[in-house]
Amino acid sequence: MESDNLQDPQEETLTCSICQSIFMNPVYLRCGHKFCEACLLLSQEDIKFPAYCPMCMQPFNQEYINDISLKKQVSIVRKKRLMKYLNSKEHKCVTHKAKKMIFCDKSKILLCHLCSDSQEHSGHTHCSIDVAVQEKMEELLKHMDSLWRRLKIQQNYVEIERRTTLWWLSVKLREEVIKRVYGKQCPPLCEERDQHIECLRHQSNTTLEELRKSEATIVHERNQLIEVYRELMTMSQRPYQELLVQDLDDLFRRSKLAAKLDMPQGMIPRLHAHSIPGLTARLNSFRVKISFKHSIMFGYTSVRPFDIRLLHESTSLDSAETHRVSWGKKSFSRGKYYWEVDLKDHEQWTVGVRKDPWLRGRSYAATPTDLFLLECLRKEDHYILITRIGGEHYIEKPVGQVGVFLDCEGGYVSFVDVAKSSLILSYSPGTFHCAVRPFFSAVYT
């Protein structure tokens, strides 16, 4: 490795502490430690949040800064080492005692100007060492960039690697909620409850097996990319004089094949919305008419600074979208209430309740602990349902009306797919003990 040749103490600062070689695309963290960008990200094998600095273990949440100045220093030092090597006595042509400043691409060797004119090499392609180094590095970096972009894209799917656990927890939570809902039905529907739970468990086990297969495919694909990328990176860090004489055709061939592999997307698990007999009929006994105040705002941050999306950073929102926010004219602190919100014309929306008062002076600011909402957001080519508890909920997106059931005494709110008379999800009893106000927000594109 090129780091083995470091002698100048100043040049020791150009060595990555992870790969123990000269920096490639150096970055630095807030704690001050510097690494190759690839070394830093690939060292986080579990892709945990927050991620930690490999040196001091301070969290950095995948936030780092490209060190342009250090990158320039690295380039200068590498060229300096090459010239030192070319000017050394050991490097001179044995036959002509001249410097070897010409590269023969056919033979992959360095030549002096007299050897390059010889009959042996007369039909070969020659160029100066500077040009050869530049072309070789450009080709290496081109392959590295192609694989790195694929690895970065795969980071959008890192949650898939832990989705099996999230799925299992989501199903267990849903099972408890379903039991609680059936327990409130009158008369108790024990047989229907057991059938519902059995169906849920069967779907859960089937999906879990598919998730594991999907996970294995993604991990295998990622490991293939990482293996080839590490080979390219190791080669790019070698001294220029060694890099030139290497035959990289096989490595470049494998790099192209790896870059063309189908990108596994991972499956998107969803639980079917099973009907609960008598659910909507029971909730309609608490039906109230909710009057809303309306406000139209432009831009996401001005509407929802509490940002539920913190649970899912990869969710994309268009800055040109318009968010219409509505909140109930009346707050509730006692009793049970049920209302429905028509969402058939909205693809992205938020429904639920939030702590009263809604307005704090003239500010719309709220903290996540003030909010008891169900939010539907677009994520790439599909939609997800999330709450501030439990993150993503793997339930089919409701089409049409969503029912909201508020139990002030119980301190929770539930959401219902009206068309299917099925439970979407429910907050746990005792989640809040305060007056709350109905809330609704929709996105207009």
From Swiss-Prot:
Name recorded for this polypeptide: Tripartite motif-containing protein 43A
Keyword NAD: no
Species for this entry: Mus musculus (Mouse)
Binding residue positions for Zn(2+): 93, 96, 115, 121
Residue ranges of every copy of the B30.2/SPRY domain listed in the record: 270-445
CDD domains, per the entry: RING-HC_MmTRIM43-like (cd23133)
Zn finger limits (B box-type): 88-129
An example molecular function term from Gene Ontology annotations: zinc ion binding
Classification via SMART domains: RING
PANTHER family associated with the record: E3 UBIQUITIN-PROTEIN LIGASE TRIM (PTHR24103)
Family: Belongs to the TRIM/RBCC family.
Zn-finger (RING-type) residues: 16-57
Presence of the UniProt keyword Phosphoprotein in the record: no
Superkingdom assignment: Eukaryota
Keyword annotations of the record: Metal-binding, Zinc, Zinc-finger
Transmembrane segments: none
